[in-house]
C-alpha cells in the first residue's frame, strides 16, 4: 500500500506540478497578452488616431470638393438657363426679322410688278398713238394721192398745188 500511496502521491504531485505548470503558463500568457495590449495599445491607439485623422481629412476634402462641384453645377445650370433664354429671344427676333424681310421682299416685288405693268401700259399706249399716227398719215397720203389723181385729170397744175397745200395745212391743223 505504501507503493500505491507513493504512486498516488507521485501521480498527485505530477498532476499538481502539471497543473501548476499549466496555471503558470496561463498566467504567463495572460501577462504577455496584457503587456502586449498595454504596450501595443499606445501604438494601436496612435495608428487608429492617425487613421481617424486621415479619414476625417479625406471626408472634409471630399465634402469640400462636393460643395465646389455643387457650386459649379449650380453655375452651369444657371448658364444653361440663361443660354436657353437667350436662344429663345434670338429665335423670336429671327422670326420677326424674317417676317419683316419677307414683307419687304413682297412689297418690293409688288412695286416692281406695278412698275412693269405701268411701263407696259405706257409702251402700249405710245405704240397705239404711233400706229394711229402712221395709219392717219397713210390715210392722208392715200387721200392726197387720190385727190391728186382726180385733180390732175380735171385741174391745172397751179390750182392743184394750191388745193394740195390747203388740204395739207388743214390736215396738219386737225391732227
Swiss-Prot record:
One Pfam family hit: ATP-synt_B
CDD domains given in the database record: ATP-synt_Fo_b
Membrane topology: Single-pass membrane protein
Bilayer-spanning residue ranges: 21-40
Source domain of life: Eukaryota
GO CC, any one term: chloroplast thylakoid membrane
Keyword Phosphoprotein included in the entry's annotation: no
Gene Ontology MF terms: ATP binding; proton-transporting ATP synthase activity, rotational mechanism
Chief place of localization: plastid
Localization per Swiss-Prot or TrEMBL: Plastid, Chloroplast thylakoid membrane
Alphabetical UniProt keywords: ATP synthesis, ATP-binding, CF(0), Chloroplast, Hydrogen ion transport, Ion transport, Membrane, Nucleotide-binding, Plastid, Thylakoid, Transmembrane, Transmembrane helix, Transport
Function recorded in the entry: F(1)F(0) ATP synthase produces ATP from ADP in the presence of a proton or sodium gradient. F-type ATPases consist of two structural domains, F(1) containing the extramembraneous catalytic core and F(0) containing the membrane proton channel, linked together by a central stalk and a peripheral stalk. During catalysis, ATP synthesis in the catalytic domain of F(1) is coupled via a rotary mechanism of the central stalk subunits to proton translocation.
Further details from the record: In plastids the F-type ATPase is also known as CF(1)CF(0).
Quaternary data: F-type ATPases have 2 components, F(1) - the catalytic core - and F(0) - the membrane proton channel. F(1) has five subunits: alpha(3), beta(3), gamma(1), delta(1), epsilon(1). F(0) has four main subunits: a(1), b(1), b'(1) and c(10-14). The alpha and beta chains form an alternating ring which encloses part of the gamma chain. F(1) is attached to F(0) by a central stalk formed by the gamma and epsilon chains, while a peripheral stalk is formed by the delta, b and b' chains.
Record-stated family: Belongs to the ATPase B chain family.
Name by which UniProt lists this protein: ATP synthase subunit b, chloroplastic
Species this protein is from: Cyanidium caldarium
Gene: atpF
Amino acid at each position: 500500500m505504501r507503493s500505491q500511496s507513493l504512486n498516488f502521491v507521485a501521480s498527485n504531485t505530477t498532476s499538481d506540478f502539471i497543473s501548476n505548470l499549466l496555471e503558470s503558463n496561463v498566467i504567463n500568457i495572460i501577462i504577455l497578452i496584457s503587456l502586449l495590449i498595454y504596450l501595443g495599445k499606445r501604438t494601436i491607439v496612435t495608428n487608429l488616431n492617425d487613421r481617424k485623422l486621415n479619414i476625417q481629412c479625406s471626408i472634409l476634402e471630399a465634402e469640400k470638393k462636393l460643395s465646389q462641384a455643387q457650386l459649379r453645377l449650380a453655375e452651369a445650370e444657371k448658364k444653361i438657363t440663361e443660354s436657353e433664354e437667350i436662344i429663345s429671344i434670338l429665335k423670336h427676333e429671327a422670326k420677326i426679322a424674317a417676317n419683316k424681310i419677307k414683307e419687304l421682299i413682297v412689297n418690293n416685288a409688288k412695286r416692281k410688278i406695278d412698275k412693269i405693268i405701268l411701263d407696259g401700259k405706257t409702251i402700249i399706249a405710245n405704240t397705239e398713238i404711233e400706229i394711229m399716227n402712221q395709219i392717219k398719215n397713210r390715210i392722208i397720203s392715200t387721200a392726197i394721192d387720190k385727190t391728186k389723181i382726180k385733180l390732175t385729170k380735171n385741174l391745172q397744175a397751179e390750182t392743184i398745188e394750191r388745193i394740195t397745200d390747203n388740204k395739207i395745212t388743214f390736215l396738219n391743223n386737225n391732227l
